[in-house]
Amino acid sequence: MVDNRLSPHGGKLVERVLDPKEAPGRIAGLKTVPVKGQTVRECVSLAYGFFSPLEGFMGRADVDAVVNKMQLASGYVWSVPLVFDMPKQQIDELEIRTGDSILLTFREKPLVILEIEEIFTYDKELMAGKIFGTTETKHPGVRRTYGYADHFLGGRVTLVSEPIIREPFKRFWKPPAVLRKELAAKGWERAVAHQTRNVPHTGHEWLMKGAWFASQATGVLVNPVVGEKRAGDYIDEAIILGQDVLREAGYFREDVHAVSLLFWDMRYAGPREAVFHAIVRKNLGCTHHMFGRDHAGVGDYYGTYDAHKIFDTIPDVGIYPVLTKEWYYCPVCAGITYEGLCGHQKSKQKFSGSVIRSIIQDGVKPPRLIFRPEVFDVVMSAAEEYGFGSPFVTERYLAEAQPVLTMPDVKK
């Protein structure tokens, strides 16, 4: 039996980016629709194959299959809908019809050509309930779903130009085709992926090291999500630079650790998002994906290890899930230890994100055992250079920080 764990999901890596010479002619005369940042990130990720085998936004058959059966209409496992919404009033005003092509723009620059294969409606309450396991608007994914307009446009997207990625993200922007070549050049036959939206404390570090041991991996690919931010989150610059410095400071050897970014806005869909993450990292060339406690969860909507259990209920997606428990500080062991090994359960001290954040907010360097000093220094440096003095997202950051990606003008 042939192991397909180095193959993209669906067997073929999607890449839909126009040749610069073609762009002017392809977009001439198209109706234009401006879009927000979330759609931009999804379009770029679709066009470069992060979401293979998808070539664009889902039609009704795919949405229905994903919502009810956690698979695409073709039968491939898929867990989170990817849709493009538009109000019917706007559709009517622009006289958009099935079979049309329209130009989506960002900040008045051409983004993608959307070939409209279907215009449809869908029950948003049904979608939210199936995907998130709740219809409560306190859940951020439910709120996002209810915020969709009343119609959806399904169809393939083609990126008009290569995006411009600003610093410090530029060196971490590696589309699947590029990253796969880099991992092959490193000799990483077994690569384990780490999903994160945080600056790393030592619990995260040992989560990665434990998964490396458990999977007998050649290397660890840290793949932070860069997307929508809320006040109080770490700024993206601090996250990606903080992750990268673990290798630069020697906590991982140069040949067993790498960092690349993923444009994606978290849905906080718990176990369903865990499956989505596994598929995306499979497309990046990873053979394994680590899943710890409360993966992609929010509040108390999901069980601690629901993201582990879901892999027992679905067909093999072509990437090995590495299921780990919690790493924490044990004062009796006098170090970082693992829930599956340590017998001092009553003494364990969990890594409190809120406590660490409050210490950092005061400019105090946390104890080395829970936060590497090099990480702290990078985080504070990022705060000064990119965060207007704060390593956390503020209203000023939301209003004034430049987008991570923009689109160039198309030369005629």
Where are these regions (language model features)?
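Active-site cores that bind ATP or allylic diphosphates and position pyrophosphate for catalysis
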Residues: M1-K412
